[in-house]
Amino acid sequence: MANHKSAIKRHRQSVERAGRNRAARTRVKNAIKQVRTAITGSDKAQAGEALVAATSVLSKAASKGAMHWKKAARKISRLARAVNSIEAQ
């Protein structure tokens, strides 16, 4: 355990941040799952709504530093491409 006051504070802050980041990553995973479920159900309208929600969640996670912004952009791009491919099938 840390002995210095500043080290104790840094540890406390890192634990709080880890919890926040874990919650943000969980929200991202759940949002992506909803989009994937709508895609497998071939429901274009529901998939579109889920994509909008997932885009918001991913962008927020990236802006808060829970994930890299390029990773968020890549996931949004791939989800959008998958939703747009529903029509083509």
Curated annotation (Swiss-Prot):
InterPro entries on file: Ribosomal_bS20, Ribosomal_bS20_sf
GO biological process, one term: translation
Protein's UniProt keywords contain Ribonucleoprotein: yes
Keywords for the protein's UniProt record, in alphabetical order: Ribonucleoprotein, Ribosomal protein, RNA-binding, rRNA-binding
Organism of this sequence: Desulfovibrio desulfuricans (strain ATCC 27774 / DSM 6949 / MB)
Protein name: Small ribosomal subunit protein bS20
Its biological purpose: Binds directly to 16S ribosomal RNA.
Lineage start: Bacteria, Pseudomonadati, Thermodesulfobacteriota, Desulfovibrionia, Desulfovibrionales
Similarity remark: Belongs to the bacterial ribosomal protein bS20 family.
Region (Disordered): 1-26
Listed Pfam families: Ribosomal_S20p (PF01649)
S-S pairs: none
Family matches, as HAMAP family: Ribosomal_bS20 (MF_00500)
Biased segments, Basic residues type: 1-12
GO molecular function, one term: small ribosomal subunit rRNA binding
GO cellular component terms, semicolon-separated: cytosol; small ribosomal subunit
NCBIfam families xref list: S20
Gene field: rpsT
